[in-house]
Amino acid sequence: MKFPAALTALLVLGTAFAIADDKPVAAKPEAGREIVLFNGKSLDDWEMVDVGGSGQVELEGGLMLINQGENISGAVYKKAAALPMINYEITLEAKRMQGVDFFVGLTFPVGDVKHCATLVCGGWGGSVTGISSIDGLDASENNTSSYQRYNDNQWYPIKLRVTAKNLSAWVGDKQVIDEDIEGKKISVRPGPVESYLPLSFTTYNTMAAIRNVKLTTIAEPK
């Protein structure tokens, strides 16, 4: 049986739509899924980056040790592309062992690997805490900036929460950042930290220890 050309075209078009409708839709990450980023046993998933004068990153006693360098020092998580980019929390414990600048520079993606920011703890002489950068302003200049006291060789539990509309952070039980970011430009501070995208730990002229690093997916806020 022969069909008119117009009818044949409609049949083909309808079939195409039916096939398209049958394509699987990517499922959203299940809330509460926990991913261990550093287990204290290996640095295989991390890669040290030397931007010139950087300290070594080593595994010692179950800790990630970022040794003091003359510049930014740290390591990048090699499997970041497989992680959720939004609606997640990262938790860790960190301590400053020597030095007078930031002992936590947690660079993280916000939506995709091209849009990242850095949670800074102890910057600009040892106390500034905030996120670099928002609308081009770094952690010492924007609304997230605050002064927190950090003692050497004391462990600090840190939590970062990332959603499409908000960035939040806690040091211990104290919430130090609660910043709405809808419509704002998110980026890292121009300079050496750009070599540590999209997920990393860094320090500046400081030795630090990191442990118990986990990422947990969270439900999309309503």
Segments predicted by a language model, with ranges:
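Bacterial N-terminal signal peptides
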Residues: 6-15
